[in-house]
Amino acid sequence: MSIFAFSLCKSLSLFFSLFTLLFLYIISTEETIIFALIERSQYRKNYAIYDPKVHKLRNVYGAPQSFLEYMLLETEKLHSKVRRYTSPEEHPFYASYLPTPILPELSYPQQILLTGKSAVDVNSEVMRWYVEKIIDRLCKAGDDEQHGSSVLCDIAAMQALSRRIHYGKFVAESKFLKDPHTYTEYVKQGNVTAIVDLLTNVEVERRVLRRAFVKASTYGQDITGTTEGYKIDPMLIADIYRDMIIPLTKDVEVRYLFHRVGVAPPTPDTYYSRCRGPLDAFDDPKALEELQVPPVIANAKKNL
């Protein structure tokens, strides 16, 4: 179900009934992200992919670029020709360098977001997090020379993360419509703390972290003969949600709300620390029992 089922809504009440579909769609992205990371984990870290000095590639300005940057741009160029990035839910990493689609533009029935796509974009942070933080914990050390396969997995994973995080704009719009007066006042006051607190639902975030852990535990099982283990550390997935996806999504929501009201957003360093997901998501034994979290949680919690 695409989020643009929402563009068919004719009234505010209908919008909020369809918002349930947005919630379900966001949940479905969890599988996409987990499977993409599982695919990347089968290869070594292959740091040569991310080093602009290794493959001697140049960007449009003649400066060195990494193999990842080169392949990502070329992939987006191809996808742009078939109008992938005309969809408001898609955010290219290299928007300025993409060609015009060769297919006729699609007509979306109704505009949901009230800011342009380029107004809120955190893809640079998505790439930085992925390369500097995720790969280090996701993959085994070393270089297996599978650079092509690895970088294709990288692109799939980063695009999935980007899509999930930028859905924060749609979430922010729905929350704004529920209480436009309060959000408008907080934005005009520059009260970012109050905005972040209003956007945050700690119990929902706890459920997100637990659900991500359980899905990673289920989909990432690696059972060979008498040996049982995981293709990917389930707690890594929970950590990615807590430390990257949740705070970057809130960052997107905050920026969107400021642009929505017509006020320049503050720099993220003034509020980003408040956006992190909860640290106590795995402290409630009853909640874990209901989710049927495997016993490995006892050891995995040490990574928090």
Predicted features along the sequence, with ranges:
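Extended amphipathic alpha-helical regions
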Residues: 1-304
